[in-house]
A protein has these predicted regions:
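Mixed-charge, Lys/Arg-rich low-complexity intrinsically disordered regions
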Residues: 1-18, 22-25
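Acidic surface patches and DE-rich sequence motifs
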Residues: 6-7, 25, 41, 47-48, ...
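Intrinsic-disorder/low-complexity loop/linker signature
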Residues: 10, 27-29, 43, 67-68
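Hydrophobic beta-strand residues in large extracellular and virion-surface proteins
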Residues: 16-21, 35-39, 58-61, 75, ...
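Short linear proline/tyrosine/threonine-rich motifs used for host-factor recruitment
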Residues: 21-23, 30-34, 71
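Short beta-strand-centered aromatic/proline hotspots
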Residues: 29-46
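Short, solvent-exposed secondary-structure boundary/capping segments
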Residues: 44-56
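Intrinsically disordered, low-complexity, charged/polar segments
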Residues: 53-85
Length: 85
């Protein structure tokens, strides 16, 4: 399988896409979340002067099993997988 290149200014995903991603918390716990892309930052939000990949703000409808929606910001493109319908 060929590795996808994450190119600043050329995002792989669009607003409205259903995606999955993992987050690692400060306690070391890693959780997987499904959500919908709300905002695309084509040049990323991490490396302002030298962007390496786009980032996304993703709406998770059931944050950590609480039933509460949460907008998770600045998720790097390399951490996201599209959910096929």
């Amino acid at each position: 399988m060929k590795e996808q290149k994450h190119i600043p200014g050329k995002p792989m995903y669009s607003a409205g896409d259903r995606v999955s991603f993992e987050l690692k918390f400060k306690d070391g716990n890693v959780e997987t979340f499904d959500g919908t892309i709300e905002i695309v930052d084509r040049f990323g939000a991490w490396e302002i002067d030298n962007p390496r990949e786009p980032s996304y703000d993703i709406l998770v409808c059931n944050w950590r099993g609480s039933g509460t929606p949460m907008l998770v910001k600045h998720i790097r493109e390399s951490k996201i997988t599209k959910i096929e319908k």
